[in-house]
Amino acid sequence: ASLLTTAPAIEVAGTASSGEVEPVVVSLADGLWIGVGSDHTDRELETVGVTLSKQLCAKPVAPQLWRYAEVEDHWDRLVLRSHAIQGGKRRLYQEGPVAALRPPRELMSRYRPGTDILPPGSVMFCGTLAVMGGIAAAERFEIELEDPVLQRRLRHGYDIAPLPIEG
């Protein structure tokens, strides 16, 4: 949880990191909520170890959430989307239905066998979609979860500030 941020910018080590849009389940005392986040990852370190590469970067999330109960019956119709901005050019980076991912209740039951809910205070990133045109670093990353049934969107964007790697 210490890596989660709604900040408009993150700092990363070097220039070899990139975002990937994911639905995010947030378990609070009043139930399950859905958000959208970026599992920002150091791609060079990923060749050494996935877990290590994921722990190195902040995890930007949109500051708004939807009640899971509001979308559970039409979950497969939700759409994930991300854009990468590099050199001032915005390009579609990922797009597709969340139906391509495992449903949140299945993921939660895999995490906690015998139940399909997370303990309050827990957050779970729920998987990502393939990248269009290859993984690439960017100066800004924008994420979105669209609900075409209720005609609404969760959005967040963040700038990526690379820090020099010395030594």
Where are these regions (language model features)?
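Catalytic-core "active-site belt" of small-molecule-metabolizing enzymes
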Residues: 1-119, 123, 130-167
